[in-house]
């Protein structure tokens, strides 16, 4: 990349084998370039080559280069295109290779040549479809990349060629997690010579998971030979440049249509780069500027849409309908959730975290121009996200072992059982169970454990508790029936002695499945007791004593005594969890952005003192990194500090953690809760106490009213007793809130026993909380209406505990 002709000092560039030196032969000063006319010829057919004057190194499209960016380790890339740009005088677009040393051993294909780390070839490269810009000063030298046959037959690796000779036989995605089958790299080079856009498109379709596409299976199965034949077939259909210009006015729609089709095949179709990429159009049609001058731009868009529609309309409609049905139906077992850690084909360019290579310095778009520090901040935020996949679960070894042994024993003995897992939100209950299932799956694949089925039912995702019957029967039979029929079929199925695999059912958010008759819970805990059921139920809830307080004796007795409690994380454990995620960073990014140990300890202690919720600790740290990134970018804007900042590490300090915590404390919801009167806070305290006492997320309004009055009666703290001392030494909070008004309470004839059942203006208080989104109310009759929180319980607790009067109740 050269921003101007001045940056080409020491280099020469050539167009169509005609030397166009960019320096004056006498003075060595840059000369004014002549205007590049687009009228006589198409610039898309011009190929640019470069020559370094120092060592006469020549670079052209298709060359393999050794590139070093920002003092990082040198990496290998193939030159996809050299072109004149809009923002820069010259753009050098490359596609990166990933070295074997940058691939995690666990991510390598499960084949014989990658079985042991000691047998891996350190000179093996993996081609990716990730595109990037490089600067002329970052180019070190050319390298040789050979196919597997050439490498094994003709090459001996020694110190003389170890750094310049490589082998490539597979491609992979930018994260080094998804790999292609073995191919002949020489055939891939032939495809590049014929059409470098099809070359990138071929790698991209083989390595990047696609979103829904009716023809995706067909595209995945294409080999390099098929793609070469396809390119050869397309060649005769292309028009010559002169023919396109002559026919521009008469056949405007057709040529525009061809250009739009070519754009669809390009790997960087961002709207802000269409004009800059006009010279690299695959079909070599007229420039986009000519197309913009067309008198019928709308017709072009309509034609583009028609080109993308498959010929087999009925098949396309059926597949679309099947796809939509599988997504919108919560009961379809074939519904798959896409993994967030894998890039999508819809992205303009996938990320490349494992290469440790800077993406440039412009910062003008997401695929090109992200410096190393920004990439470090980005990866750090990804690792601190709660959805990040972990290789292990720290600080939950004992609970993991208990669940693992119970499930393994039940599977081996082919018996049913119930397991109750309890703990506050964010302590790793569901994650631990899923990790146990994953470990058991690996044992099954290795043949060391009997095969089993697994089903996860989340109470919050069910329209009603009875839907659990439908999901379980669908897992067993693959058929959808009504809940009532499913219950009958399940009862008959588990009663019969038929060959079946053990079935593990994870019932998450158990308190949401509780009904008045409790028949759903009874059946799910009763079926494992059948001798031939082989049903293993794992019930997960937030409170340990929920079976005794909520479920009847006949249900709690069937649940059994296999109970595992997850206690809240201590501040040492939270610190270990955060450090475990920081260890997942690449070595380069670890040096660029550092979270101080004091900052980790501060965040851990703050969260551990409230709830021990690991999700909250990670969220605070992630927000602190965002605040630190903002400070970094603002300091980078100072021209004097830019070079110094780029070469130094940036630290996330306690001040950043403190700001992140203050944001949660001073959020709009927190400020609204702080402004509420005592009576409204008392209602919220009653909701929290009732939830704690019952273990249920939803509680009746009548129970909350009783909880409020009982709490005030039992209030014995100094602040609670003397809060009304200035008005009347004998007046209590019950007299004030449950009387008919302050003036009547001050009347000497008022009897404290003559109080109302509810506090004054109670209906107005509840409606205010509902309208502001704090509570949700299911109106089924006033006293029997169900109330549940609409915001985080932790946020309400943190606000109420800062209130002297109300904190005594909690």
Swiss-Prot record:
Residues 21-30 have a biased composition (Polar residues). Residues 21-52, 219-317, 334-370 are annotated as: Disordered. Coiled coil: none annotated. Its main location: nucleus. One of its GO terms (cellular component) is nuclear origin of replication recognition complex. PROSITE patterns: BAH (PS51038). It holds the Pfam family AAA_lid_10. One of its GO terms (biological process) is DNA replication initiation. Residues 219-235 have a biased composition (Basic and acidic residues). ORC is composed of six subunits. This is Origin recognition complex subunit 1. It comes from Debaryomyces hansenii (strain ATCC 36239 / CBS 767 / BCRC 21394 / JCM 1990 / NBRC 0083 / IGC 2968) (Yeast).
């Amino acid at each position: 990349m050269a921003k101007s002709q001045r940056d080409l000092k020491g280099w020469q560039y050539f167009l169509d084998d005609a030397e166009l030196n960019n320096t004056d032969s006498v003075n060595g000063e840059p000369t004014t370039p002549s205007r590049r006319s687009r009228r006589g010829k198409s610039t898309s057919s011009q190929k640019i080559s470069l020559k370094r004057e120092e060592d006469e190194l020549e670079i052209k499209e298709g060359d393999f280069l050794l590139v070093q960016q920002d003092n990082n380790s040198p990496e290998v890339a193939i030159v996809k295109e050299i072109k004149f740009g809009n923002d820069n005088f010259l753009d050098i677009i490359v596609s990166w290779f990933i070295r074997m040393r940058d691939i995690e051993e666990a991510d390598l294909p499960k084949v014989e040549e990658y079985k042991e780390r000691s047998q891996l070839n350190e000179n093996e490269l993996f081609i990716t479809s990730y595109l990037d810009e490089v600067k002329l000063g970052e180019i070190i030298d050319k390298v040789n990349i050979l196919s597997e046959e050439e490498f094994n037959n003709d090459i001996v690796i020694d110190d003389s060629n170890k750094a310049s000779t490589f082998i490539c036989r597979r491609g992979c995605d930018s994260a080094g997690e998804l790999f292609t089958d073995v191919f002949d790299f020489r055939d891939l080079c032939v495809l590049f010579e014929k059409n470098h856009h099809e070359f990138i498109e071929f790698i991209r379709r083989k390595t990047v998971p696609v979103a829904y596409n009716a023809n995706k299976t067909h595209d995945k199965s294409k080999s390099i030979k098929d793609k070469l034949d396809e390119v050869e077939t397309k060649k005769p259909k292309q028009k010559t440049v002169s023919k396109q210009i002559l026919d521009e006015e008469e056949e405007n729609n057709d040529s525009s249509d061809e250009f739009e089709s070519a754009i669809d095949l390009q790997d960087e179709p961002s709207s802000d780069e269409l004009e800059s990429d006009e010279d690299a159009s695959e079909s070599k049609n007229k420039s986009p500027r000519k197309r913009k001058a067309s008198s019928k731009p709308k017709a072009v868009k309509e034609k583009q849409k028609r080109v993308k529609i498959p010929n087999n309309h009925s098949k396309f409609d059926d597949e679309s309908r099947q796809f939509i049905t599988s997504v919108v139906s919560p009961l379809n077992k074939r519904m798959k959730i896409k993994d967030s850690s894998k890039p999508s084909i819809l992205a303009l360019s996938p990320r490349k975290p494992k290469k440790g290579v800077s993406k440039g310095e412009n910062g003008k778009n997401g695929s090109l121009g992200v410096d190393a520090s920004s990439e470090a901040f980005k990866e750090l935020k990804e690792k601190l996200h709660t959805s990040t996949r972990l290789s292990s679960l720290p600080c939950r070894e004992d609970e993991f072992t208990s669940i693992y042994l119970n499930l393994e024993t039940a599977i081996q003995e082919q018996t049913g059982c119930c397991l109750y897992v309890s703990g506050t939100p964010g302590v790793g209950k569901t994650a631990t169970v899923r990790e146990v299932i994953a470990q058991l799956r690996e044992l099954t694949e290795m043949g060391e454990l009997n095969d089993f089925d697994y089903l996860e039912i989340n109470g919050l995702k069910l329209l009603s508790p009875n839907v659990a019957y439908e999901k379980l029967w669908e897992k067993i039979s693959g058929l959808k029936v009504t809940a009532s029929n499913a219950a009958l079929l399940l009862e008959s199925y588990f009663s019969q002695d038929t060959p079946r695999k053990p079935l593990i059912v994870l019932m998450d958010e158990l308190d949401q499945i509780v009904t008045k008759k409790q028949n759903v819970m009874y059946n799910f805990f009763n079926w494992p007791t059948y001798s031939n059921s082989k049903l293993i139920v794992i019930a997960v809830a937030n409170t340990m004593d929920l079976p005794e307080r909520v479920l009847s004796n006949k249900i709690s007795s069937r649940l059994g005594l296999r109970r595992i409690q997850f206690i809240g994380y201590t501040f040492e454990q939270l610190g270990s969890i955060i450090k475990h995620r920081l260890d997942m960073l690449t070595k380069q990014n670890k040096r660029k952005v550092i979270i101080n140990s004091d900052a980790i300890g501060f965040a851990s202690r703050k969260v551990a003192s409230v709830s021990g919720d690991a999700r909250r600790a990670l969220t605070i740290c992630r927000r602190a990194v965002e605040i630190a990134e903002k400070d970094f970018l603002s300091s980078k804007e100072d021209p004097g500090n830019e070079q110094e900042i780029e070469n130094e590490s940036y630290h996330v300090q306690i001040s950043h953690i403190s700001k992140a915590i203050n944001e949660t404390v001073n959020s709009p919801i927190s400020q609204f809760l702080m402004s509420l009167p005592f009576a409204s806070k008392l209602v919220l305290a009653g909701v929290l106490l009732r939830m704690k006492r019952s273990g249920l997320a939803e509680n009746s309004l009548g129970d909350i009213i009783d909880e409020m009055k009982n709490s005030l009666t039992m209030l014995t703290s100094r602040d609670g007793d003397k809060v009304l001392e200035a008005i009347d030494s004998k007046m209590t909070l019950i007299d004030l809130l449950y009387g008919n008004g302050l003036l009547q309470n001050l009347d000497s004839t008022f009897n404290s026993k003559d109080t109302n059942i509810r506090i004054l203006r109670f209906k107005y208080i509840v409606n205010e909380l509902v309208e502001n989104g704090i509570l949700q109310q299911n109106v089924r009759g006033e006293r029997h209406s169900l109330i549940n929180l609409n915001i985080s319980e932790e946020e309400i607790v943190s606000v109420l505990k800062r209130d002297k009067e109300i904190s005594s109740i909690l």
